[in-house]
Amino acid sequence: MVFDARLGYDPDEWEECPEPEHFLVFSGFTRYMLTFAAIAFVYYFFKLLDDKNKKESGEKEEPQTSVESVLAKAGDKLHDVKEQVQQHIPESAEELMREADQYLKEQAHSVQNNVHQFAEQAANKFPSLEVDLNLGHPIDATREKFDTVLSSVNNHLHETKNMDLSPTSRDSTQFEQIPSIAPEESAFGHDFEHVPPHLKTAAEQYYAQQHQPPPVPQHKIVQPVPISPTDQQLLHEFDIYDAPAHQRMNQISEQLGQLGQKTPAQLQQLQHAQLAHQQLQQQGVFQPIQQPSPLQIQTHPQQPYFDFSQLSPASQARYNQQQFVDISQLSPGAGALIAEQQASGAFQPVTKKLGREKRLSEQDERALQDWEKEKALLEADRLKKLLDHEVGGDSTDLDSSQKAYDHFAPASHISYESHSGAAQIQPMTPTAPKRADVPAPQVTSITNVRDSQLTDYDISDFHAHDEPHYHTVLTPQQLQQNQQQHQQPSAIDRRRTTADSDDYVKVSEPIYDYPPKGHEAPVAEPKRISPTEAAQLQELYQEYDLGLDLPGVAPIQGVAKPPVQQRTPLQIQQQVVQNVQNQPNMMARQNSVPESPRTVINVPISRKTDVPIQVQQQQNQFSYNVPIQVKDDPRNLATADLFVQDAQEYVAHQQNQQDKGSFVMEEEMLSLHEPETGSNKKKLTPKNPSFEATSRQVRTNDVFERIEHDEHDDMTYAPEIQSVEIPPDQMSETSENMIDYFDKVAAESEQQIQHLQEQQNTLKKQQIETSIPDSSLLKPVGRAPQILPAFGNRISSNSSLGSAGRSGSGVSSSDVYPYRHLRKQSSLLSVLGVTSMQEMLLAITSLDSLSEAMRKAGLETTNLIFGIDYTASNKYQGEESFGGRSLHTIHPHVTNPYQQVISILGRTLAPFAGQGRLGVYGFGDAKTGDWSVFNLKGEGGDCRSLDEVLNVYNTVTPTVALSGPTNFAPLIYQAMEICQKSRDYHILVIIADGQVTNERATRRAIVQACQHPLSIIVVGVGDGPWDMMRIFDESLPKRPWDNFHFVEFHEIVKKSTNMEDGDVKLAVQSLLEIPDQYRCICELGLLDRSIPPRGSEIRREMMHNPL
């Protein structure tokens, strides 16, 4: 340390620190050694791994190489075997016969060689025998020569055996020195002369004197013949070289005797084969050899062959019977054709080539029997059908191998061609009756029909019997008798078959049952239709309101025949002729099968002054009259015509769309109705529009497809409002533009209306009932759309809002479209004696006073249904209107917009609760999405009070997962189902936070709801936008009455001075149209109740009877 005086330290006072001690764990040498050891370990470790990997790879490569070599060897061997087999397989019967001849020649040459060798050996061993070595005889004389040789040898052996020799002398050296030879091949002897008598004399003298075998002279002793290696091997093989003489002689005798029995049989078999071969050559037909030749057995010892002797008697009998054709059941003319073809050799049976080595099992036998029966029935019926209807196919045989397989394979594994000709006829059923209405035809040009010209035809009519009967070929006399017996047709039981079954064959053209020429086909009497079908028939005319005033279904009366001449406009009764199915053109059906019966509905109509309109269809002319009100406003008539055209084009477009899966399309919902009969009048009840509403979950985005180019629906379909915000001050201009458009169209059609009025005046005093043809012939003539009542008959009025018992003045334009002038004639305004909304708000100061005014306006009872929007947009829709909080916020001291709307409308309509039930449904959550709704009460049903509704909402809302998108259609259909079940008036209050994403589906649901006693009120909560809702409320021209109303909650509340004032304003603007909608529902017959008075009548009564 360096000392510095400025630090102020004294060096003497410093403490000296001891030097630190260093402890080394390993010395330097140790460290070097450890490093070297580590490096060496790593080196050897990786080397070991490398060697191991190489070893494993080498082991893998070695078996791979061996496998490849084995496969290569196997392939070469297989190739050699294949070539060897192909070389020895005979190609035809001629080659087999040639091989057989060659084989016999080789065998004959071998036999002659063996005989020559045997004769030489016999001459050497038996000097006393004189053997004829002339072997130039042909093979045909071999049997005779063999008999001569055998006789000579037997005689010689017999004489030698009967010599008077002692037992010891029998084993003399001369017999021991002569070894017996047992020839291996078939040895044939020639002519041996008898043994000389001196041999017998010398032996007798020797035995008589010496009582022992006499000495034989050396020149008389037969010396052993030198045996070649081949003979030596032959002797050892038969093991007779050391046998005693008498045993050897006995064996020679036995073997010669066997040869005498076997060889002639082989020769005889060969001769028979040659004769058969010559006969086949003379006939020009070669029949394959069923028994393989000896050369084939020798060359291919492993090749299996089929022996027909192994078949059971039943199988052999069936096999033999298949070679015959039974034509006893054929129609006249067919038997002669088949017999001629059989005589010419066209039906020669084909011998089956089979390769079996064992007998069939019992199960296979049963399967074969079933298959034979089925195949016999099929072929018999097929041929019968073809011949009876002058059709057929080529007369060709099946391939022999395919027939052999089909004969012995199970039925499930057999495939055959149904268009094979008569060459494959199988045993037939004893009786196959013909069709009663088709005479027996003649067979013509069967072989000219080809598969490309054939069509499917059902031949199942001819399965008259289950079990087949087998016959043999009959004589021409028997054929003629059978043909005469089966000329008379008989009735048969017909059954249908599918195109996949084996009963179908192909014919050249369809076969129809035409009536006899010169007789007209009887016209089938139309069947009566049920009231349900009648109601569905009426829906075709009034689904989109084509201008027919049909109050109900009249009793079905007589059948109306199609007009032959032009009818006059004067008719007794209107006849609505409607075919249940889509009928083709009438002229196109005159030359075809008699058409299906048509349904005739006679519907009485009220007598009006009508204008005849002529409609011509081909040669038949129809005249019908469509009623037109002379006093209708031309603007309304032109507008109605525009609407009717829109509806027709909409229906035509929707009919081309097919349903997707099992979903319920809204077009189908719009057309379903169910009639109900009352005591004195007919009632039509609409069917459930959505059937299982919430249980059948269908995505509306998939079902209700948006049509981007809807040229004729631009008045209600406004896609531009989804991307362009329309200021509120411009909405009135939009509505006025629509009215101006109606005025323009009305002015253009005014001239046409005047012309129709002139025609109507000419027929004003006549009583006309119109005959209307098919609905497709009708054209709109300016009638406003009208809808058939769902629960009762409509009153006799031409207006959708008119009343028969009221003023007799003409129908005003407001009656046709009341929603355009509803506020000017509101019943609430008339009851309160005010003329504007501001005056009404000043007159109504509480919800109770509003309820009393609605009761005076004619509202009797109603039921509430709440729809809660649970889409995810509720989270941010309250940025401006609800302080940035979610619209579904549940807090003890804060009331969200949903709770406020439920409370306000519930308190207002509580005095009108008819059934005391309040339905609460949610939509747009994660589970239901935009294709269904769910009940907040669960399976418990509806709520009983307003407090219960609020409690259920407060309990369920925190547990619901918000999702989307927004779609009102499922909720509207659920409300329609409730109305149908309860048959009571309902008000559906939909509380939503934004416009719907599927505008087209919602619009259709709103239009469909007009057929039910249902009013729809949409209360918009949140920041909006609400452009689409305003369009819905102002411009839905397809509705016969205004069933939809929209109010914006926050727009009303923020203009209010206090909370109570805001509640009253919301209730007034929400329920302003309810009394008038209720009156419209009663007038249309949707409710079987008394019709409340109009606003004008209420005002008139108040003026005459002031308080």
UniProtKB/Swiss-Prot annotation:
Keywords: Cell membrane, Coiled coil, Cytoplasm, Membrane, Transmembrane, Transmembrane helix
Transmembrane segments annotated in the record for this chain: 23-45
Membrane side Cytoplasmic: residue ranges: 46-1107
Coiled-coil segments: 67-124
Gene disruption phenotype: Embryos stop elongation at the 2-fold stage and have defects in the organization of the myofibril lattice. pat-3, deb-1, pat-4 and pat-6 are slightly mislocalized in the post 1.5-fold stage. At the 1.5-fold stage, unc-89 and myo-3 localization is normal. However, at the 1.75- and 2-fold stages, unc-89 and myo-3 are mislocalized into large foci within muscle cells.
Signal peptide residues on this chain, from the entry's feature table: none
Compartments where found: Basal cell membrane; Cytoplasm, Myofibril, Sarcomere, M line
Region (Disordered): 478-501, 673-698
Composition-biased stretches (Polar residues): 687-698
One example of a Gene Ontology biological process annotation: positive regulation of sarcomere organization
Similarity-based family: Belongs to the copine family.
Designated name of the protein: Copine family protein 1
Species in which this protein is naturally found: Caenorhabditis elegans
Gene this protein is translated from: cpna-1
